[in-house]
Curated annotation (Swiss-Prot):
Pathways per UniProt: Carbohydrate acid metabolism; D-glucarate degradation; 2,5-dioxopentanoate from D-glucarate: step 2/2
Keyword Membrane: no
Name the UniProt record assigns to this protein: Probable 5-dehydro-4-deoxyglucarate dehydratase
Reactions listed under catalytic activity: 5-dehydro-4-deoxy-D-glucarate + H(+) = 2,5-dioxopentanoate + CO2 + H2O
Keywords (A to Z) from UniProt: Lyase
Species this protein is from: Streptomyces griseus subsp. griseus (strain JCM 4626 / CBS 651.72 / NBRC 13350 / KCC S-0626 / ISP 5235)
Length: 320
């Protein structure tokens, strides 16, 4: 656990937010040694924060004990260099148990995922996240997606909830996000509520989200191609439009189109990408399935295209 307040550390980040995959061995058990290597490699590559056991990390497929061990391993590998956040989800009672396990394991904060299966009204969602935030001393980011999509008024209430520091948007409705940002700015002036672009390949919509003031984003690509993810992050931050557009056109858009070819590819393609870089993190757990051989070949070509573009950009004097 780091000493500085989480919100302040995340507000001042200078790199992508890293969502590691959870490694499984040939027997299907969590491989903590490989997971540690994956987390350490990401931190060494320039991750600004680690979000362990979240969507990309197959939170849904982990037992409470596996979750506790993996979060603890991520905390140990971070050693205070960057904040570590952990996923927490399902119904309120179980989400609280995961949150307390994350706190005991030394995490700095929580990513609160949507409640399991149920479709609740806005008041019910607010009560759920307020109870989760009150259950520990960890600061909480609420994940908007699927069955947890909020009105601007609800987000204003969340922003006033002790312990809730931000909203990660995985819904992708820019009109709604603009109204949310405006409502919180109006009704909680001077506040420091954080917003994150949390779409599956957030870089594709990075320029659009920056237009409404959302500069923080999760990077699934960072898990398997940190060089490309960092180059894009720096180009977007510095206004290198040529590199941003090149990577969007020749890497990120093809990747998103490939991701759309199979259910669960937002996770299984990332895991395949990590394996392609030489770290055997195993396969995804059921009910997710592995990408087809043809799609893995496509992924190899997309990664090669992205790296070729970086090499051309560097050769032209643009840096990387």
């Amino acid at each position: 656990m780091t000493s500085a307040p989480l919100a302040a550390r995340l507000r001042d980040v200078a790199g992508p937010l890293f969502f590691p995959v959870t490694a499984f061995g040939p027997d299907g058990a969590v491989d903590l040694a490989v997971f540690r290597a994956h987390v350490r490699a990401g931190i060494d590559a320039g991750a600004a924060a680690v979000f362990a056991c979240c969507g990309t990390g197959e939170f849904h497929a982990l037992t409470p004990e596996e979750f506790r061990l993996a979060v603890g391993a991520a905390v140990e590998e971070s050693a205070g260099q960057v904040p570590v956040l952990a996923g927490a989800g399902y119904g309120t009672a179980l989400a609280v148990q995961y949150a307390r396990a994350a706190e005991e394991a030394g995490a700095d904060g929580l990513l609160a995922m949507p409640p399991y299966l149920v479709v609740a009204d806005q008041q019910g969602l607010l009560h759920h996240y307020a109870a989760l935030a009150a259950a520990t001393g960890l600061e909480t980011i609420v994940y908007q997606r699927d069955n947890a999509v909020f009105t601007p008024e609800t987000v204003v209430a969340l922003a006033r909830t002790p312990g809730v520091i931000g909203l990660k948007d995985g819904h992708g409705d820019l009109d709604l996000m603009q109204r949310i940002v405006s409502a919180v700015r109006t009704h909680r002036p001077g506040g420091d509520f954080l917003y994150f672009n949390g779409l599956p390949t957030a870089e594709l919509t990075g320029p659009a989200y920056r237009g409404i003031g959302v500069t923080l984003y999760s990077s699934a690509v960072f898990a398997f191609a940190p060089d490309i993810a960092l180059a894009f992050y720096r180009a977007l931050d510095s206004g290198d439009d040529a590199l941003v557009d090149g990577l969007l056109d020749h890497f990120y858009r093809p990747l998103v189109e490939l991701r759309a070819q199979g259910r669960g590819y937002a996770v299984s393609l990332v895991k395949a990408g990590v394996r392609l870089q030489g770290l055997d993190v195993g396969e995804v757990r059921t009910p997710l399935t592995e990408p087809t051989a043809a799609h893995v070949k496509d992924l190899i070509e997309i990664i090669a295209s992205g790296r070729a573009l970086l090499a051309e950009h560097a050769a032209a004097g643009g840096g990387a």
